[in-house]
């Protein structure tokens, strides 16, 4: 293990001991905000220090076995102990490297998932509905909360555009790699010749701003229009101007919300989505040069990049960024995304480790 890494782990071990002392004091809950910060830090450091303790124990085991090598009767046993200890140390070191990787500050945030139908007309809108269901089923499995923010239904079902808010522990860290182009290949219900059609949707996963104040929005930069909400397929149509359209003039970002009958609630939702979109735009601009330098395949989140193909006749899903193909499309469309997300996270961690290695 590198000396710099060991030094860092020693510092974390010392800090955890300090936290244990602070959290054991009688007046620790007097300041609840401070208490929450301490418990959060303790929860983050605990697993790292625990792994480091196992690594140090393995190193002690190796040292003890080295001392037995001089005894001919113990030589075979000692060599086996040394080999076993070194294997454990190597495995633990890789885990510790991953644990020490710089964390994305947005990882624990709630998210907005925006799905837009692209090429393929009605079939694309239907697939947008299928993608929405996939993410909602995944959120349900995680016991996350979901709130519809804005929807523009298609006449034949599905959505031209839909935005949902998903709130739950680690929502962004789990779904941030979903941003990009999603392509579907299947025989549409309206196809009489049995031909396979290809259509596409784009997905954007945006971290929610803690408060609207986190993103500076000058009211003078906003144009807010109200209009009557419209529904597809004979749905209820409001008689009042409850729908809200907010335009951010400097960036040209437009958000419409009409799902609630309250104009005030629609405006509040629109401003939340607007803040997330502005934050997302700033984040991508900030990381564009860095991503170009690293040529990161996983974390770029480029909306124009085709990241995945869903082939229904073959029952397969292929993620083009990591060349992963899974022949369990039905389960994936039902929200079983753990294997896919795990593979993407592992590849992203490998990229980060490689970039840190280059920096060294």
From Swiss-Prot:
Chain positions with N5-methylglutamine modification: 235
One of the record's GO cellular component terms: cytoplasm
Pfam families: PCRF, RF-1
PTM comment: Methylated by PrmC. Methylation increases the termination efficiency of RF1.
Keyword terms, alphabetized: Cytoplasm, Methylation, Protein biosynthesis
Cellular localization per UniProt: Cytoplasm
Xref: SUPFAM superfamilies: Release factor
GO function terms (MF aspect): translation release factor activity, codon specific
Primary subcellular site in the record, as a coarse category: cytoplasm
Family the UniProt entry places it in: Belongs to the prokaryotic/mitochondrial release factor family.
Its biological purpose: Peptide chain release factor 1 directs the termination of translation in response to the peptide chain termination codons UAG and UAA.
Protein name (Swiss-Prot/TrEMBL): Peptide chain release factor 1
Organism whose genome encodes this protein: Burkholderia multivorans (strain ATCC 17616 / 249)
Gene that produces this protein: prfA
């Amino acid at each position: 293990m590198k000396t710099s890494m060991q030094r860092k782990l020693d510092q974390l071990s010392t800090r955890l001991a300090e936290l244990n002392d602070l959290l054991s004091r009688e007046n620790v809950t007097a300041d609840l905000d401070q208490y929450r910060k301490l418990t959060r830090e303790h929860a983050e450091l605990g697993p790292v220090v625990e792994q480091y303790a196992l690594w140090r124990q393995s190193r002690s085991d190796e040292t003890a076995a080295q001392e037995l090598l001089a005894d001919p009767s113990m030589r075979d046993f000692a060599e086996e102990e040394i080999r076993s200890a070194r294997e454990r140390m190597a495995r633990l070191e890789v885990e510790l490297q991953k644990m020490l990787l710089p964390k994305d500050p947005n990882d624990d945030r709630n998210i907005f998932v925006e799905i837009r139908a692209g090429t393929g007309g009605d079939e694309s809108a239907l697939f947008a509905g299928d993608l929405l269901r996939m993410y909602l089923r995944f959120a349900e499995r995680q016991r996350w909360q979901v709130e519809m923010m804005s929807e523009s239904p298609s006449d034949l079902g599905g959505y031209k555009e839909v935005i949902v808010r998903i709130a739950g522990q680690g929502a962004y860290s789990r779904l941030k790699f979903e941003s990009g182009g999603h392509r579907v290949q299947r025989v549409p219900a309206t196809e009489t010749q049995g031909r396979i059609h290809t259509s596409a949707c784009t997905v954007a996963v945006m971290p929610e701003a803690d408060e609207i104040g986190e993103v500076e929005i000058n009211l003078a930069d906003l144009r807010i229009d109200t209009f009557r909400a419209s529904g597809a397929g004979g749905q209820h149509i409001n008689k009042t101007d409850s729908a809200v359209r907010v335009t951010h003039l400097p960036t040209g970002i437009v958000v419409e919300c009409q799902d609630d009958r309250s104009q005030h609630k629609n405006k509040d939702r629109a401003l939340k989505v607007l803040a997330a979109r502005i934050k997302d735009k700033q984040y991508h601009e900030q990381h564009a040069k860095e991503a170009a330098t690293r040529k990161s395949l996983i974390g770029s989140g480029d909306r124009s990049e085709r990241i995945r193909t869903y082939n229904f006749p073959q029952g397969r899903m292929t993620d083009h960024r990591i060349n992963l193909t899974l022949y369990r499309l039905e389960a994936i469309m039902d929200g079983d995304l753990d294997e896919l997300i795990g593979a993407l996270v592992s590849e992203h961690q490998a990229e980060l480790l490689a970039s840190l290695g280059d920096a060294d």
